[in-house]
């Protein structure tokens, strides 16, 4: 259009806890295990990584976020759902960090576009496995080297288009 436009863009993914049958039946355990970490626009789902897993998930975007959520209740609302999330209704996320309960990844971008301007945001969802001796980069810090390399491989539109054509 000929006028500047302001809009809010939200992303959302609900992480599994690595075992679909257990995820849907063992609520007492599941609601006490969820763990996440946020570094800039990357949300790391690291449930049980320290104790018994050698893998984690990462949900990222290639642009700086305005806000984020990692708690389903914070993003969707206690009695809400993905059809009409509370964060979207409010126009922003609350920067929640999930400790147990239902970990999610949600990004919020507040954008202003000049007339005729286009903006691309790349979202990625990845799964990372680390050898046991390489699980941590420092005591208690998950080794993010493989995740960072993956995010760097898909950081631009051209990189994503090239990867898609190679499929």
Name the predicted role of every residue range.
Residues 76-81, 100-102, 126:
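Glycine-centered flexibility motif
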Residues 89-101:
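Active-site-adjacent bridging/hinge elements
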Residues 100-103, 165-167:
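Substrate-binding groove/exosite segments of carbohydrate-active enzymes
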